[in-house]
Amino acid sequence: MKVAVIGAGSMGGMHANLLGAMDEVDEIFIVEADATRAEAVAMRAGGSVATFERALAEADAIIVATPPELHRVAVGAAIDVGRHVLCEKPLTESLASTIELTRHVEKAGTHVELGFQRRHDAGFRAAREAATGRLHLVRLTAHDPLVTPRPAPSGPPPEVAPIFRDSSIHDFDVVRWLTGQEVTEVSVEAGRRDGSRPTDPREIESAVVSMQLSGGTLAVLEASWLHPRGYDIRIELVSDETATTGGLSPRTPSRHADWPDATDGWSGYLERFEPAYRAELVAFLAASRGEGSPASTARDGLEAMRIAVAATRSFREARHVALDEIAGLARSQVA
Protein backbone atom coordinates (compact mmCIF):
# COMPACT_ATOMS: atom_id res chain seq x y z
CA MET A 1 0.00 0.00 0.00
CA LYS A 2 0.95 3.60 -0.53
CA VAL A 3 0.16 5.81 2.47
CA ALA A 4 0.36 9.60 2.76
CA VAL A 5 0.98 11.37 6.06
CA ILE A 6 -0.26 14.96 6.01
CA GLY A 7 1.62 16.91 8.67
CA ALA A 8 5.03 16.01 10.06
CA GLY A 9 4.84 17.17 13.66
CA SER A 10 5.11 14.80 16.62
CA MET A 11 2.03 12.78 15.65
CA GLY A 12 2.75 12.72 11.92
CA GLY A 13 6.35 11.74 12.58
CA MET A 14 5.26 8.94 14.90
CA HIS A 15 2.79 7.58 12.34
CA ALA A 16 5.43 7.75 9.60
CA ASN A 17 7.96 5.84 11.72
CA LEU A 18 5.46 3.10 12.50
CA LEU A 19 4.40 2.85 8.85
CA GLY A 20 8.04 2.50 7.84
CA ALA A 21 8.27 -0.74 9.82
CA MET A 22 5.16 -2.33 8.28
CA ASP A 23 5.60 -4.92 5.53
CA GLU A 24 2.30 -4.04 3.89
CA VAL A 25 3.37 -0.42 3.30
CA ASP A 26 5.31 -0.02 0.04
CA GLU A 27 5.60 3.76 -0.07
CA ILE A 28 5.15 6.64 2.36
CA PHE A 29 4.48 10.20 1.21
CA ILE A 30 5.21 13.02 3.67
CA VAL A 31 3.31 16.26 3.10
CA GLU A 32 4.53 19.14 5.26
CA ALA A 33 4.92 22.90 4.74
CA ASP A 34 8.22 22.95 6.65
CA ALA A 35 10.64 21.47 4.11
CA THR A 36 13.37 20.71 6.64
CA ARG A 37 11.00 18.86 8.92
CA ALA A 38 9.46 17.00 5.98
CA GLU A 39 12.86 15.77 4.80
CA ALA A 40 13.85 14.65 8.30
CA VAL A 41 10.64 12.68 8.85
CA ALA A 42 10.79 11.14 5.37
CA MET A 43 14.40 10.06 5.90
CA ARG A 44 13.67 8.41 9.27
CA ALA A 45 10.63 6.58 7.92
CA GLY A 46 12.11 5.59 4.57
CA GLY A 47 9.56 7.70 2.72
CA SER A 48 9.62 10.64 0.35
CA VAL A 49 8.42 14.23 0.46
CA ALA A 50 5.39 14.89 -1.74
CA THR A 51 2.95 17.63 -2.59
CA PHE A 52 -0.58 17.40 -1.27
CA GLU A 53 -1.83 16.95 -4.83
CA ARG A 54 0.49 14.01 -5.49
CA ALA A 55 -0.44 12.40 -2.19
CA LEU A 56 -4.15 12.59 -3.04
CA ALA A 57 -3.55 11.18 -6.51
CA GLU A 58 -1.24 8.28 -5.62
CA ALA A 59 -1.83 7.21 -2.01
CA ASP A 60 -4.21 4.39 -1.16
CA ALA A 61 -4.90 5.81 2.31
CA ILE A 62 -4.36 9.17 4.01
CA ILE A 63 -3.34 10.02 7.57
CA VAL A 64 -4.12 13.61 8.61
CA ALA A 65 -1.94 14.88 11.46
CA THR A 66 -2.01 18.63 10.87
CA PRO A 67 -3.20 21.23 13.39
CA PRO A 68 -6.98 20.83 13.91
CA GLU A 69 -7.89 23.99 12.01
CA LEU A 70 -6.51 22.36 8.84
CA HIS A 71 -8.32 19.05 9.23
CA ARG A 72 -11.51 20.03 7.43
CA VAL A 73 -9.72 20.96 4.20
CA ALA A 74 -7.36 17.96 4.22
CA VAL A 75 -9.99 15.38 5.12
CA GLY A 76 -12.53 16.90 2.74
CA ALA A 77 -10.10 16.78 -0.18
CA ALA A 78 -9.16 13.18 0.58
CA ILE A 79 -12.70 11.85 0.76
CA ASP A 80 -13.64 13.76 -2.40
CA VAL A 81 -11.20 11.53 -4.32
CA GLY A 82 -12.38 8.39 -2.54
CA ARG A 83 -9.52 7.93 -0.08
CA HIS A 84 -10.00 6.44 3.36
CA VAL A 85 -8.65 8.66 6.13
CA LEU A 86 -7.24 8.32 9.62
CA CYS A 87 -7.59 11.79 11.15
CA GLU A 88 -5.96 12.74 14.43
CA LYS A 89 -8.33 14.09 17.05
CA PRO A 90 -10.19 16.37 17.26
CA LEU A 91 -11.97 15.96 13.92
CA THR A 92 -11.87 19.75 13.53
CA GLU A 93 -11.27 22.76 15.73
CA SER A 94 -14.92 23.68 16.41
CA LEU A 95 -18.34 22.11 16.83
CA ALA A 96 -19.82 23.82 13.75
CA SER A 97 -17.03 22.66 11.44
CA THR A 98 -17.14 19.17 12.96
CA ILE A 99 -20.84 18.93 12.15
CA GLU A 100 -20.15 20.17 8.63
CA LEU A 101 -17.32 17.70 8.02
CA THR A 102 -19.26 14.77 9.50
CA ARG A 103 -22.10 15.52 7.10
CA HIS A 104 -19.59 15.65 4.22
CA VAL A 105 -17.98 12.34 5.25
CA GLU A 106 -21.23 10.45 5.62
CA LYS A 107 -22.54 11.73 2.31
CA ALA A 108 -19.30 10.75 0.54
CA GLY A 109 -19.47 7.18 1.82
CA THR A 110 -15.75 6.75 2.46
CA HIS A 111 -14.57 6.01 5.96
CA VAL A 112 -12.86 8.52 8.19
CA GLU A 113 -11.43 7.03 11.36
CA LEU A 114 -10.45 9.20 14.32
CA GLY A 115 -7.11 8.85 16.08
CA PHE A 116 -8.74 7.44 19.21
CA GLN A 117 -5.91 4.99 19.84
CA ARG A 118 -7.13 4.04 23.32
CA ARG A 119 -9.71 1.83 21.60
CA HIS A 120 -6.71 -0.27 20.52
CA ASP A 121 -4.94 -0.39 23.90
CA ALA A 122 -4.64 -3.99 25.08
CA GLY A 123 -5.51 -3.19 28.70
CA PHE A 124 -8.51 -1.07 27.78
CA ARG A 125 -9.81 -3.74 25.41
CA ALA A 126 -9.38 -6.46 28.03
CA ALA A 127 -11.20 -4.36 30.63
CA ARG A 128 -14.04 -3.74 28.21
CA GLU A 129 -14.41 -7.47 27.52
CA ALA A 130 -14.22 -8.37 31.21
CA ALA A 131 -16.88 -5.90 32.36
CA THR A 132 -19.89 -8.20 32.31
CA GLY A 133 -23.20 -7.53 34.00
CA ARG A 134 -24.98 -4.24 34.54
CA LEU A 135 -22.40 -1.46 34.53
CA HIS A 136 -22.83 0.99 37.40
CA LEU A 137 -19.72 3.15 37.39
CA VAL A 138 -16.86 4.09 35.06
CA ARG A 139 -13.89 5.97 36.43
CA LEU A 140 -11.36 7.52 34.07
CA THR A 141 -7.98 8.89 35.15
CA ALA A 142 -6.18 11.12 32.64
CA HIS A 143 -3.12 12.88 34.04
CA ASP A 144 -0.58 14.53 31.75
CA PRO A 145 2.89 15.52 32.98
CA LEU A 146 3.29 18.90 34.64
CA VAL A 147 3.89 21.52 31.97
CA THR A 148 5.05 25.13 31.95
CA PRO A 149 2.16 27.49 32.73
CA ARG A 150 0.42 28.78 29.62
CA PRO A 151 0.35 32.51 28.86
CA ALA A 152 -2.56 34.46 30.31
CA PRO A 153 -5.53 34.15 27.94
CA SER A 154 -6.53 37.11 25.80
CA GLY A 155 -9.47 37.72 23.53
CA PRO A 156 -12.90 36.11 23.77
CA PRO A 157 -13.05 32.74 25.54
CA PRO A 158 -13.27 29.69 23.26
CA GLU A 159 -16.27 27.46 22.72
CA VAL A 160 -14.36 24.51 24.16
CA ALA A 161 -11.63 24.45 26.80
CA PRO A 162 -8.21 23.33 25.51
CA ILE A 163 -7.97 20.58 28.14
CA PHE A 164 -11.29 19.13 26.98
CA ARG A 165 -10.66 19.52 23.23
CA ASP A 166 -7.04 18.40 23.14
CA SER A 167 -6.87 15.82 25.96
CA SER A 168 -10.19 14.80 27.50
CA ILE A 169 -11.75 14.23 24.08
CA HIS A 170 -10.03 10.82 24.25
CA ASP A 171 -11.84 10.06 27.51
CA PHE A 172 -15.17 11.31 26.16
CA ASP A 173 -14.77 8.85 23.30
CA VAL A 174 -13.60 6.02 25.55
CA VAL A 175 -16.59 6.26 27.88
CA ARG A 176 -18.96 5.81 24.92
CA TRP A 177 -16.87 2.95 23.52
CA LEU A 178 -16.52 1.15 26.86
CA THR A 179 -20.20 1.29 27.74
CA GLY A 180 -22.07 1.40 24.43
CA GLN A 181 -24.07 4.25 25.97
CA GLU A 182 -24.39 7.92 25.14
CA VAL A 183 -23.54 10.73 27.53
CA THR A 184 -26.76 12.57 28.39
CA GLU A 185 -25.62 15.10 31.01
CA VAL A 186 -22.34 16.64 32.15
CA SER A 187 -21.17 18.65 35.15
CA VAL A 188 -17.68 20.04 35.79
CA GLU A 189 -15.50 21.29 38.61
CA ALA A 190 -12.21 22.87 37.54
CA GLY A 191 -8.98 24.05 39.12
CA ARG A 192 -5.57 25.63 38.57
CA ARG A 193 -2.10 24.87 39.92
CA ASP A 194 -2.20 27.82 42.32
CA GLY A 195 -5.43 26.59 43.92
CA SER A 196 -7.63 29.32 42.48
CA ARG A 197 -10.74 28.66 40.43
CA PRO A 198 -10.32 29.34 36.70
CA THR A 199 -12.46 32.09 35.23
CA ASP A 200 -11.63 31.37 31.58
CA PRO A 201 -11.78 27.90 29.91
CA ARG A 202 -8.16 28.37 28.80
CA GLU A 203 -7.07 28.52 32.45
CA ILE A 204 -8.32 25.03 33.34
CA GLU A 205 -5.43 22.78 34.35
CA SER A 206 -7.36 20.11 36.25
CA ALA A 207 -10.99 19.08 36.19
CA VAL A 208 -13.47 16.55 37.48
CA VAL A 209 -16.13 15.76 34.89
CA SER A 210 -19.21 13.86 36.02
CA MET A 211 -21.29 12.23 33.28
CA GLN A 212 -24.73 10.63 33.30
CA LEU A 213 -25.08 7.94 30.61
CA SER A 214 -28.15 6.84 28.70
CA GLY A 215 -28.24 3.37 30.30
CA GLY A 216 -28.06 4.70 33.84
CA THR A 217 -24.31 4.28 34.29
CA LEU A 218 -22.35 7.07 35.97
CA ALA A 219 -18.90 8.07 34.70
CA VAL A 220 -16.32 10.28 36.39
CA LEU A 221 -13.24 11.69 34.69
CA GLU A 222 -10.30 13.09 36.65
CA ALA A 223 -8.30 15.15 34.13
CA SER A 224 -5.10 17.03 34.85
CA TRP A 225 -2.14 18.69 33.16
CA LEU A 226 -0.31 18.81 36.50
CA HIS A 227 0.99 15.30 37.24
CA PRO A 228 4.43 15.64 38.88
CA ARG A 229 5.73 12.17 37.95
CA GLY A 230 4.64 11.35 34.41
CA TYR A 231 1.72 10.24 32.24
CA ASP A 232 -1.07 8.32 33.93
CA ILE A 233 -4.04 7.00 31.92
CA ARG A 234 -6.33 4.41 33.54
CA ILE A 235 -9.90 3.18 33.59
CA GLU A 236 -12.01 1.32 36.14
CA LEU A 237 -15.35 -0.32 35.43
CA VAL A 238 -17.68 -1.51 38.20
CA SER A 239 -20.73 -3.64 37.45
CA ASP A 240 -23.00 -5.88 39.48
CA GLU A 241 -20.73 -8.80 38.50
CA THR A 242 -17.19 -7.46 38.15
CA ALA A 243 -14.78 -4.66 38.99
CA THR A 244 -12.10 -4.27 36.32
CA THR A 245 -9.17 -1.89 35.89
CA GLY A 246 -7.24 -1.15 32.71
CA GLY A 247 -4.01 0.82 32.38
CA LEU A 248 -2.35 -0.14 35.67
CA SER A 249 1.22 -1.36 35.31
CA PRO A 250 4.58 -1.24 37.13
CA ARG A 251 5.17 1.96 35.14
CA THR A 252 2.07 3.77 36.38
CA PRO A 253 3.70 7.03 37.53
CA SER A 254 2.24 7.20 41.01
CA ARG A 255 3.89 6.63 44.38
CA HIS A 256 2.30 3.46 45.71
CA ALA A 257 1.98 3.72 49.48
CA ASP A 258 1.12 0.02 49.83
CA TRP A 259 3.94 -1.48 47.76
CA PRO A 260 7.34 -0.43 46.36
CA ASP A 261 7.48 2.79 44.42
CA ALA A 262 7.48 2.72 40.62
CA THR A 263 10.87 3.94 39.43
CA ASP A 264 10.34 4.33 35.70
CA GLY A 265 6.94 5.87 35.05
CA TRP A 266 5.50 6.57 31.63
CA SER A 267 6.91 9.89 30.41
CA GLY A 268 4.30 10.74 27.77
CA TYR A 269 1.62 9.55 25.39
CA LEU A 270 3.96 8.36 22.61
CA GLU A 271 5.73 5.98 24.98
CA ARG A 272 2.63 4.84 26.85
CA PHE A 273 0.51 4.14 23.79
CA GLU A 274 3.02 3.13 21.08
CA PRO A 275 1.61 -0.44 20.86
CA ALA A 276 -1.91 0.98 20.59
CA TYR A 277 -0.86 3.42 17.86
CA ARG A 278 0.70 0.51 15.95
CA ALA A 279 -2.45 -1.59 16.34
CA GLU A 280 -4.53 1.38 15.25
CA LEU A 281 -2.54 1.72 12.01
CA VAL A 282 -2.71 -2.01 11.27
CA ALA A 283 -6.49 -1.97 11.71
CA PHE A 284 -6.89 1.23 9.67
CA LEU A 285 -4.89 -0.13 6.73
CA ALA A 286 -6.85 -3.39 6.84
CA ALA A 287 -10.15 -1.49 6.80
CA SER A 288 -8.86 0.64 3.91
CA ARG A 289 -8.29 -2.59 1.96
CA GLY A 290 -11.82 -3.74 2.73
CA GLU A 291 -10.64 -6.34 5.25
CA GLY A 292 -12.48 -5.00 8.27
CA SER A 293 -14.55 -2.16 9.65
CA PRO A 294 -13.08 1.12 10.91
CA ALA A 295 -12.58 1.23 14.67
CA SER A 296 -14.23 4.65 14.88
CA THR A 297 -16.05 7.09 12.63
CA ALA A 298 -16.44 10.79 12.01
CA ARG A 299 -19.63 10.64 14.06
CA ASP A 300 -17.65 9.34 17.02
CA GLY A 301 -15.47 12.43 16.64
CA LEU A 302 -18.57 14.62 16.57
CA GLU A 303 -20.07 13.05 19.69
CA ALA A 304 -16.81 13.45 21.60
CA MET A 305 -16.67 17.12 20.57
CA ARG A 306 -20.26 17.64 21.72
CA ILE A 307 -19.35 16.31 25.17
CA ALA A 308 -16.31 18.61 25.27
CA VAL A 309 -18.50 21.60 24.43
CA ALA A 310 -21.04 20.58 27.08
CA ALA A 311 -18.26 20.27 29.67
CA THR A 312 -17.01 23.75 28.82
CA ARG A 313 -20.52 25.17 29.10
CA SER A 314 -20.95 23.47 32.48
CA PHE A 315 -17.73 25.09 33.69
CA ARG A 316 -18.70 28.50 32.38
CA GLU A 317 -22.28 28.48 33.69
CA ALA A 318 -21.68 26.41 36.87
CA ARG A 319 -24.52 24.01 36.19
CA HIS A 320 -25.37 20.59 34.84
CA VAL A 321 -25.61 20.66 31.03
CA ALA A 322 -27.74 18.20 29.07
CA LEU A 323 -26.28 16.99 25.77
CA ASP A 324 -29.63 17.84 24.17
CA GLU A 325 -28.58 21.48 24.55
CA ILE A 326 -25.56 20.96 22.28
CA ALA A 327 -25.98 21.06 18.50
CA GLY A 328 -25.50 17.75 16.72
CA LEU A 329 -26.34 15.90 13.53
CA ALA A 330 -29.29 13.54 13.19
CA ARG A 331 -28.97 10.61 10.80
CA SER A 332 -31.63 12.16 8.57
CA GLN A 333 -29.46 15.27 8.14
CA VAL A 334 -26.67 13.45 6.28
CA ALA A 335 -28.01 13.84 2.75
Name what the model sees in each region.
Residues 1-44:
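N-terminal Rossmann-like dinucleotide-binding module
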Residues 15, 47-102:
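Beta-loop-alpha module in the N-terminal Rossmann-like domain of NAD(P)-dependent dehydrogenases
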Residues 33, 269-282, 296:
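Active-site loop of classical SDR/Rossmann-like NAD(P)-dependent oxidoreductases
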Residues 61-64, 286-335:
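C-terminal helix-rich "cap/oligomerization" subdomain common to oxidoreductases
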Residues 64, 87, 112-114, 221, ...:
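Hydrophobic residues in well-ordered beta-strands that form the structural core
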Residues 100-118, 134-140:
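Rossmann-fold dehydrogenase core element
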Residues 118-200, 318:
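Predominantly a Rossmann-like dinucleotide-binding segment in NAD(P)-dependent oxidoreductases
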Residues 173-251, 278-291, 328-335:
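Contiguous beta-strand/loop segments that form the cofactor/metal-binding neighborhood of enzyme cores
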